[in-house]
Amino acid sequence: MAVPARRTSKAKKNKRRTHYNLTAPTVKFDETTGDYSRSHRVSLKGYYKGRKIAKANAAK
């Protein structure tokens, strides 16, 4: 079983972890529905690229 020969220092550990982060989702304003939605996805009202392609789910 592989075991590290030496303990990893805090600096080395933190330098490795600099890229462990989350990115905010891209959000665009949809002129058809008038609300914001994520890019390249169908809006909650069933629109994609300004065209109605799906039925919207009715909220209960």
From Swiss-Prot:
One of its GO terms (cellular component) is large ribosomal subunit. GO terms for biological process: translation. It comes from the Bacteria. Transmembrane segments: none annotated. It holds the Pfam family Ribosomal_L32p. Coiled coil: none annotated. GO terms for molecular function: structural constituent of ribosome. Keywords: Ribonucleoprotein, Ribosomal protein. InterPro entries: Ribosomal_bL32, Ribosomal_bL32_bact, Ribosomal_zn-bd. The keyword Ribosomal protein applies. The keyword Cell wall biogenesis/degradation does not apply. Belongs to the bacterial ribosomal protein bL32 family. This is Large ribosomal subunit protein bL32. It comes from Streptococcus mutans serotype c (strain ATCC 700610 / UA159). The gene is rpmF.
